[in-house]
Amino acid sequence: MSHTPHELAVEFPAHVVRMHDLKGTNAHFARLCDEYHEVNRAIHRAESRAEVVTEEHESMLRRQRLALKDQIATMLEA
């Protein structure tokens, strides 16, 4: 497992199997997960100062991650 905080398996531990299944059968869900991971890693790089970003950009990334997480949660609960 990654050391990056907020990975989907950590955020939704009860849905790990369902996430795996949906990634294989639902292209939209797979794209949302890929985008979530990309944004989450960008936030982690900003937090760890590996990449310098403005406070506004980091805030925008956090809002984007939350929106993606909400969409993923909705699909997991469906």
Model-assigned labels for residue ranges:
Residues 1-78:
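Extended, charge-rich alpha-helical interface modules
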